[in-house]
């Protein structure tokens, strides 16, 4: 708010007359800094009259040090006029120039003014502890406001202002202390007042306990999420042995099976928990103590373990026993072992024949083939994935054995030469050993049969064939189909 607006024209004219009278005083006829005659400007903060040149320098110092006003043109406030009346040039210089040398050269007036008011170079050492005139000005302002001519409704004295400032924080602190005291709990005054709150607390505790019971019952009523997993697990079981094993006692199953049984019987255990936890909710009387809740939680595991756990491990092992799928690598290993056994049988038959003619050797080999094919038709009930066995049953197997015996009998005729053994093409399923002769044929690098007659003459004498030289792949041609 601009305080100059409150100054009326009559008051402004009165202030102007006062200032003109102050300028006529002998101490104020010269500038306070440069001693120029006829000053028309004044420093409101310092309470001195200065010339126009020094007024510009005072403006550069800042309003916190010197606030410049025109003595004849500007509007003055009542407190400013009262302060400059009390100060004047002589009184102000007695403070600012207390230690100034008597004939000091004031040529550099700007440096002189800055050293005088900013640096306080010539202020007496004892006077530096005292307040400068501008502080006294503030005090005078408060005194001016307390006068009867000041119409702004301020306090009567600066002392009262200071006392009011002290009382305001004190009252605030008292209110804060009172507020904190209200938040503190009130101590009990007698035994009669203590008994009633205890009864209220007991009555209030019963609904809280009932709410806790309701909260405990609510989760048990939710549908169990484990049922989906158990249903999926029951779908994977392949036999009905679980119904027989459910009658076993818990001690019959090992420790690791109990974990699987606990996983499968989780659904039935939750149903038992539903029945047990619903009983306190149905009863109207509240529980006597917290031990009842502990008993409820202690009883629930016993109910869940009453049912005998199912032999889940047996069900899982039955899955592996019932399966008919075997890896090709395992099947290949079994076939290699069987072929090695057949070779041993052929070698034994060849040694037993000794120098017998070719027909006898062929008969022994045919008998060995009957035994090997009977064992090899369905080894262990396994089947190679992607291949089917054409032999449907025992009747087909017997027909195949009869055909093999007929072929063997045809080969045992004495008039048949050695080259009759070439009637079966070499299309073996597995190539055994290195490039050996098979029925007078030698396999080349391209897999095509090549007659041994091109490399060596055909022997007319009967020679015994070993088991590894016999090729029975033609008999099994078509038994395996490609996937």
Curated annotation (Swiss-Prot):
UniProt xrefs under InterPro entries: ARF_GAP_AGD5/15 (IPR044520), ARFGAP/RecO (IPR037278), ArfGAP_dom (IPR001164), ArfGAP_dom_sf (IPR038508)
CDD domains assigned to the protein according to its UniProt record, in alphabetical order: ArfGap
Domain Arf-GAP: 16-130
Tissue expression: Expressed in inflorescence stems, abscission zones, stigmas, roots, roots meristems, embryos, and floral and leaf vasculatures.
Gene ablation phenotype (knockout): Abnormal vacuolar trafficking of soluble cargo proteins, and premature termination of the shoot apical meristem and of floral meristems leading to short siliques and abscission defect. Plant missing both AGD5 and MTV1 are severely dwarfed and have altered subcellular distribution of clathrin-coated vesicle (CCV) cargo exported from the trans-Golgi network (TGN). Floral organs remain attached to the plant body after the shedding of mature seeds, including abnormal petal breakstrength (pBS). Ectopic enlargement of abscission zone (AZ) cells during shedding.
Chain intervals with Basic and acidic residues compositional bias: 123-144
Bias (Polar residues) ranges: 239-248, 261-271, 434-448
PANTHER family: ADP-RIBOSYLATION FACTOR GTPASE-ACTIVATING PROTEIN AGD5
Entry protein name: ADP-ribosylation factor GTPase-activating protein AGD5
């Amino acid at each position: 708010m601009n305080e100059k607006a409150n100054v009326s024209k009559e008051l402004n004219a009165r202030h102007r007359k006062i200032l003109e009278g102050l300028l006529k005083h002998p101490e104020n006829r010269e500038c306070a800094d440069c001693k120029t005659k006829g000053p028309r400007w004044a420093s409101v903060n310092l309470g001195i009259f200065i010339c126009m040149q020094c007024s510009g320098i005072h403006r550069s110092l800042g309003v916190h040090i010197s606030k410049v006003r025109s003595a004849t043109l500007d509007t003055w406030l009542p407190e400013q006029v009262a302060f400059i009346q009390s100060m004047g040039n002589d009184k102000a210089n007695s403070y600012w120039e207390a230690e100034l040398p008597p004939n000091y050269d004031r040529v550099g007036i700007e440096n002189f003014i800055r050293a005088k008011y900013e640096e306080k170079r010539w202020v007496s050492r004892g006077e530096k502890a005292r307040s400068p005139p501008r502080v006294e000005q503030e005090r005078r302002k408060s005194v001016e406001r307390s006068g009867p001519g000041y119409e702004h409704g301020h306090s009567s004295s600066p002392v009262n202002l200071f006392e009011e400032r002290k009382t305001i924080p004190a009252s605030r602190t008292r209110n804060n202390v009172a507020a904190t005291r209200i938040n503190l709990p009130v101590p009990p005054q007698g035994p009669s007042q203590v008994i009633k709150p205890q009864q209220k607390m007991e009555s209030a505790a019963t609904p809280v306990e009932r709410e806790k019971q309701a909260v405990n019952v609510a989760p048990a009523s939710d549908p169990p999420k484990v049922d989906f997993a158990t249903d999926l697990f029951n779908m994977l079981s392949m036999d009905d042995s679980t119904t027989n094993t459910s009658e076993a006692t818990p001690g019959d199953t090992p420790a690791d099976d109990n974990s699987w049984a606990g996983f499968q019987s989780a659904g039935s255990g939750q149903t038992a928990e539903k029945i047990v936890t619903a009983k306190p909710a149905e009863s109207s009387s509240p529980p006597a103590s917290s031990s009842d809740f502990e008993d409820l939680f202690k009883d629930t595991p016993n109910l869940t373990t009453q049912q005998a756990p199912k032999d889940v491990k047996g069900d899982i092992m039955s899955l592996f026993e019932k399966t008919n799928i075997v890896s090709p690598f395992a099947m290949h290993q079994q076939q290699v072992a069987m072929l090695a056994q057949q070779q041993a049988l052929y070698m034994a038959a060849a040694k037993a024949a000794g120098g017998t003619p070719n027909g006898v050797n062929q008969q022994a080999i045919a008998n060995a083939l009957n035994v090997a094919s009977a064992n090899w038709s369905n080894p262990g009930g396994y089947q190679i994935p992607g291949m089917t066995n054409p032999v449907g049953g025992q009747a087909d197997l017997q027909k195949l054995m009869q055909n093999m015996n007929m072929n063997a009998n045809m080969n045992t005729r004495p008039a048949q030469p050695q080259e009759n053994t070439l009637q079966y093409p070499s299309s073996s399923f597995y190539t055994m050993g290195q490039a050996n002769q098979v029925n007078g044929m030698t396999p080349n690098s391209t897999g095509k049969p090549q007659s041994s007659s091109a490399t060596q003459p055909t022997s007319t004498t009967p020679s015994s064939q070993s088991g590894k030289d016999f090729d029975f792949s033609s008999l099994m041609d078509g038994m395996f189909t490609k996937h």
